Curated annotation (Swiss-Prot):
Enzyme class: oxidoreductase
Top-level taxon in the UniProt lineage: Bacteria
MF terms in GO: 4 iron, 4 sulfur cluster binding; 4-hydroxy-3-methylbut-2-en-1-yl diphosphate synthase activity (ferredoxin); 4-hydroxy-3-methylbut-2-enyl-diphosphate synthase activity (flavodoxin); iron ion binding
Purpose: Converts 2C-methyl-D-erythritol 2,4-cyclodiphosphate (ME-2,4cPP) into 1-hydroxy-2-methyl-2-(E)-butenyl 4-diphosphate.
Gene: ispG
Short name of one Pfam family: GcpE
InterPro entries: Dihydropteroate_synth-like_sf, IspG_bac, IspG_bac-typ, NO2/SO3_Rdtase_4Fe4S_sf
Binding site for [4Fe-4S] cluster: C297, C300, C343, E350
Family: Belongs to the IspG family.
Membrane spanning stretches: none
Entry keyword set: 4Fe-4S, Iron, Iron-sulfur, Isoprene biosynthesis, Metal-binding, Oxidoreductase
Protein name, UniProt field: 4-hydroxy-3-methylbut-2-en-1-yl diphosphate synthase (flavodoxin)
Native organism: Francisella tularensis subsp. mediasiatica (strain FSC147)
Length: 405
């Protein structure tokens, strides 16, 4: 961990603890029309099953607000009690006041200081939401976005900057505006009576270097629990890499208590992809373990056969499918390391270093595949059923090592 690591307040969101010494929490957000209860429930269940520990939903109109209690009831029928966060912009004060059951059903409210109200109405409407949060004992995320920054605050800071002998750059003013908006709003919430351990803050931008710079400054200036994420990461590889780089750097420095990866899904792609990326970031940083890791080689001229790629895919899919039940039956199985290697160069070594590994024959090598368990050669596989036999060996290893003694 880096020198920025700060001890933050601990915030309870439903049954999930964020901040302090607690593990970094994975969040996600639905993209359904919230008033469509059936579709929204289906997507929340999918996100939660994929590993999302908190799910945010849009509450943008009266139909959505009225649907929230029903969504929570339907989720409970599936034994799903994942905390739901209501995402409010512009009219949150009205919706929470008019639909008190919605206010009770949500586990947290998200407020954007840039659009909670304008002019003289801003403080009044912000205060209305905070008072409702206090009355219902709910935490609040004060989420600032560069794309919807409080323009009055920005104008004020620009005027103050212009009067300085050595004015800041426009980029520095941007950073200052984001942080000032979040911290002034949090301070006002505390003045209204909301406890510090009910406040999470975020300052989101869409560029990697900007996000890193803003959160490094923010972490030095406060001890609120911090929500990390690019406000718009983008689609596909670009979005995944941008999120992994920015969040990875900050998390390694000890900055951030909960994360969301805001991917633009490809057409027909599952919404759960953003959850998978969050979990991969945390697991590859060594901060959390969710599912057994699979080490596999990229392939080269020695591995002319595509079989090792097919076996790697089968093993990974099998582990992902099984983890839903394994995590309840076999304590610690999520930390298991599996290796699927394609030739003799690194195959035996990587397989020995894993809990269980297989070294497949490369081009011109003897058509046998040694299997290593806990560093020792345990089996030699050959023939047309290597995939099935290796997966069976993995299954037996899990039962023997992680089963109740």
């Amino acid at each position: 961990m880096g020198s920025y690591m700060n001890k933050t307040s601990v915030v309870k969101v439903g049954n999930v603890l964020i901040g302090g010494d607690n593990p970094v929490v994975v969040q996600s957000m639905t993209d359904t029309y919230t008033a469509d209860v059936e579709k929204t429930v289906r997507q929340i269940l999918a996100l939660h099953k994929a590993g999302s520990e908190i799910v945010r939903i849009t509450v943008n109109d009266e139909s959505a607000a009225a649907a929230v209690p029903e969504i929570v009831k339907e989720l409970a029928k599936h034994d799903c009690h994942v905390p739901l966060v209501g995402d409010f912009h512009y009219n949150g004060h009205t919706l929470l006041s008019k639909y008190p059951e919605c206010a009770k059903a949500l586990a947290k409210y998200r407020i954007n200081p840039g659009n909670v109200g304008f002019g003289k109405k801003k403080d009044t409407q912000f205060a209305e939401i905070i008072k409702i949060a206090i009355a219902n004992d709910k935490p609040v995320r004060i989420g600032v976005n560069w794309g919807s920054l409080d323009q009055a605050l920005l104008a004020r800071l620009i005027d103050e900057n212009n009067a300085q002998e050595n004015p800041l750059s426009l980029q520095q003013i941007m950073y200052k505006a984001l942080i000032t908006s979040a911290l002034e709003s949090a301070k006002y919430a505390e003045e209204l009576g909301l406890a510090k351990d009910k406040i999470i803050i975020s300052c989101k931008v869409s560029e990697v270097q900007d996000l890193i710079a803003v959160y490094q400054k923010l972490a030095k200036e406060c001890d609120y629990a911090l929500h990390l994420g690019l406000t718009e990461a983008g689609m596909g590889t670009k979005g995944i890499v941008a999120s992994a780089v920015s969040l990875g750097i900050l998390l390694q420095q000890g900055i951030g208590n909960t994360i969301r990866v805001s991917l633009t899904p490809a057409p027909n792609a599952p919404r759960t992809e953003e959850v998978r990326v969050c979990r991969e970031i945390l697991q590859n940083l060594g901060m959390r373990t969710f599912t057994p890791s699979v080490t596999s080689c990229p392939g080269c001229g020695r591995t002319t056969s595509s079989f090792f790629r097919e076996l790697t895919s089968k093993v990974k899919d099998h582990l992902d499918e099984k983890m839903h039940t394994w995590k309840e039956q076999y304590h610690g199985v999520e930390a298991m390391k599996v290796a699927v290697m394609g030739c003799v160069v690194n195959g035996p070594g990587e397989s020995k270093n894993a809990d269980i590994g297989i070294s497949l024959p490369g081009s011109g090598e003897s058509p046998v595949a040694p299997v290593f368990i806990d560093g020792k050669k345990a089996h030699t596989l050959r023939g047309d059923n290597i995939s099935e036999e290796f997966i069976e060996i993995v299954e037996n290893y899990v039962k023997n090592r992680y089963g109740k003694k």
